[in-house]
Amino acid sequence: MNRFSYTLRKRAAARFFILALFVAAGIFLLTFFSRFGLRSPVLTEISPSVGSAGDILVLRGQNFGSSRGSSYVELCGNRLTESGYVSWDDDLIKVIVPGNTEDGLVYVATRAGKSNPEFFANELAIPVEMPENPMFSVPIITELSLAEAAPGQIISISGRNFGSSRGESNVYFSARREGEREESVPNLDGYDTKVETQKYVGFLTPSEADFDFEYWSENEIRVRVPDGAASGSVFVATSEGRSALQPFLVKSRVGKKTWTGRHTYLIQVGADFHNIKGGDAAAVTIHLPRPIVSALQPEAIMTESNPEPALLDYRGNSIFQITPADKTSAKNYSGARQNYVVTSCGMESEVYKDYVGLFKEKDRMLYKAYTRADEIIPADDKAVLELLPKIVFQVKNPYRQAELVFDYFVQNYKILPKTRNGDANPLDLIDKKRGDAYDFAVLYAALLRCAGVPCRILSGVLIDSDKQTRNHWWNEFYIENFGWLPVDTALGVGMEFKAFQGEPNSGKYFFGNIDAQRVAFSFAYKAIKQSLLSNKTVSMPRSFALQSIWEESTADVESYSSYWIVPAVLGIY
């Protein structure tokens, strides 16, 4: 018996050691043959090879294993965590690119080893070709002459790339109203600032009806702070892009305006024409009024037109032309219809009368335009000149003068239930003490203009709670360094009116305040020139817009009939 056998029999420790040695050898051999018996993973493709955090990365190849188990994907030096795996199959793996990923190699690791690598690039780290420097075209504001101003005051905007003339370019001021979203201007940081036809929510532009633009050049713009502007920002937009926002404060010690609500209407305007007869050159031109845009009516967007107009917007009208050949039925019928989405705002004012002064800038175009007599406002008529001092006496304050005239109307005049004939004289109201809303608006404007207070007539439709519309006229008068104030004398004296909610406002409320139950089509009377002196024209006094021509027919037109609809409300939102 040899010593080795004797030791194994006599010593238990020796026997345990030998057993452990055999077990370890067996495990080693099993692991060795198992590993080298498996096929190593092969990575043939990753998609996308360029991506960013959050992307799904797809790995294609073979020998990944039917389930993940202890296998893993290594992406750019980091092993993916449990939450990074979407699916795992023998030839396809889907993972989520984590947030800390940079450029680097991608591996698949299994018990058989690591695959060959594929390269992944983070797209945010890839250099890109710089776009053409817009500094040479996009408008840039370098300075505002005033950091704070009142409505109507002139500010000078200095900079470059404004353009030698205004054209379609514009200046935008903040304008916050009840229910309106915050100012919304696309991000300017990347200089991706090409202007498209769009509305900047929360901003308004200077008014051409108020003659707000004073001067425009490549390096300087002089513009008046528009009525309705609020503290916030100002910027310039041209066809080449937009400038950066500049902080700007709008303050007036004269008083304040509060936006009290808003309604959005889908409204239809149009006219029907029948039995147009005439020669080959016969044609009828339609001047279809468009809703205006103002501080109280900030949006008027056409959504549909049938047919398409010859001119979409010419001096506030869409122009259509129809001929005897334009037939939609055997009755020789034709016409035009347009739908608009119009937003109307209510407003209440608080005026500190002691801070209202006499108008100083009497050479200003707004003052000249809205204090003179015109085609429909007889501010220089003898009857007006005689009546005014009986109402205002020695009062010189423009706000008090406007208030005294309003009070005089409420105390002395009655409103007629129906609109009078178009050729009726509005000054009949002085003697007869009765008139319609048009008479009230004309006489009120005439008295204020005679007193040297800028005043204008707005025409449009009043909208009842049952969506019924009627032609209506009201006024606005202008206070320097404050802006326009609305006045509705017809409603002030008690014209019947169905409010959307509760009892309608009445009396003094309609001096300096206004509801949102109306849509305006005219700021003032619009004198339209006929295309040819030989053309025949049709006017429509006391209608929803104030303009000299509504229809115009060539000399070859023998006869036709027409019917204009009162703008109809199709929906309220």
Predicted region positions:
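Intrinsically disordered, low-complexity N-terminal segments that are enriched in acidic
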Residues: 247-345
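Acidic low-complexity segments
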Residues: 313-416, 424-427, 431
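Low-complexity, Gly/Ser/Thr/Pro-rich intrinsically disordered linker/tail segments
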Residues: 508-573
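Proline/serine/threonine-rich low-complexity linkers at boundaries of modular beta-sandwich domains
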Residues: 30-41, 123-138
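Immunoglobulin-like IPT/TIG beta-sandwich domains and homologous Ig-like subdomains
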Residues: 26, 34-114, 142-242
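Hydrophobic membrane-insertion alpha-helices, especially the h-region
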Residues: 15-34
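Hydrophobic/aromatic-rich core segments of domains that either
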Residues: 439-534
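N-terminal Lys/Arg-rich, disordered targeting/topogenic segments
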Residues: 1-13
